[in-house]
Swiss-Prot record:
Pfam families found in the cross-reference section: AAA_lid_4 (PF17864), RuvB_C (PF05491), RuvB_N (PF05496)
Major subcellular site: cytoplasm
Protein name per UniProt: Holliday junction branch migration complex subunit RuvB
Binding site for ATP: I49, R50, G91, K94, T95, T96, E157, D158, Y159, R200, Y210, R247
Chain sites annotated for binding Mg(2+): T95
Residues covered by region (Large ATPase domain (RuvB-L)): 13-210
EC annotation from Swiss-Prot or TrEMBL: 3.6.4.-
Family: Belongs to the RuvB family.
Region feature (Small ATPAse domain (RuvB-S)): 211-281
Places the protein is found: Cytoplasm
Keyword Repressor carried by entry: no
Taxonomic lineage from the root: Bacteria, Bacillati, Cyanobacteriota, Cyanophyceae, Nostocales
CDD domains: AAA
Amino acid sequence: MAIISSKKQPPEPNGQPNKRPESAPSVPKEKVLQPEAAIDEQGKQEESIRPQRFADYIGQKDLKDVLDIAIKAAKSRGEVLDHLLLYGPPGLGKTTMAMILASEMGVNYKITSAPALERPRDIVGLLVNLKPGDILFIDEIHRLSRMTEEILYPAMEDYRLDITVGKGSSARIRSIPLSKFTLVGATTRVGALTSPLRDRFGLIQKLRFYEVDELSQIVLRSAQLLQTQVTDDGATEIARRSRGTPRIANRLLKRVRDYAQVKSCAEVSQNIAAEALQLFQVDPCGLDWTDRRMLSVIIEQFNGGPVGLETIAAATGEDTQTIEEVYEPYLMQIGYLSRTPRGRTATKAAYKHMGFTPPNEQLSLL
């Protein structure tokens, strides 16, 4: 059975100067700005800093308001929560939100991912073992196989499982009733979902990048749970280099904590945070070596673009999917990159950040 994680909710508590890119990063073995989830040597601490209720979840106010209404309405009618699709860049809290939904509804949850559901029996085994009201979270749901999707259609709409028994002319469909459940799907590529699957979600919500003040609160909350002293300025320094992503903020916090401990610093101040993050090649705007390499390729080798995605991937050593889903969204968000039908172009702001003179200003100097 393809269950990655299955947890029962605990009782409710009693009531979050720019430099040119160098040829190689100082710390090449760990990509501290990659928001993909990774196996942490301190997995228990990673779990402990996850918020468990809406009251602890910082940011995403619009999303929380929508889900709060949906939860209260479902509870008042004694119904299960409608199926929910969460989409947005990685590391913004989609999995955490699914756990919070289970906590707020007072039900259990099961966590899996689409690549783990390769065979029909994988999803069947999950569905038949769901209890009434359970939440089934499927990460990377856009990667579901066609056969798995077709099994989900009647399960989502009518809470039944249609199984084909026999072969050829003697084949028949047998329907097995399922407990009413809530499917929460998460994806970074909502456009890659098929229309039949997407249309079966009653709620479709986007998670946005976080503001610096929200990330500062997250850093301070996590620091307290990790028993690390961080000043307000230190938290802000970490936050503004975190690419608007909580997962990155927490990861940078741990690396800064390590640096402060080795340097025998009683607390993480702004200066200590800046020194540590400089070691990891994270600049004041949150760009790492790969970001700067991308911009450098576009500006220096292709006069600002447009440049094709495959060319950028070859120049940086990253695959195209990672560039599209991890690096480009943030570069576009801060106005350093434009994506056109002909390729990627560097903006005027990117030129200035990288220490180059924009082309139009070069002409004015002639």
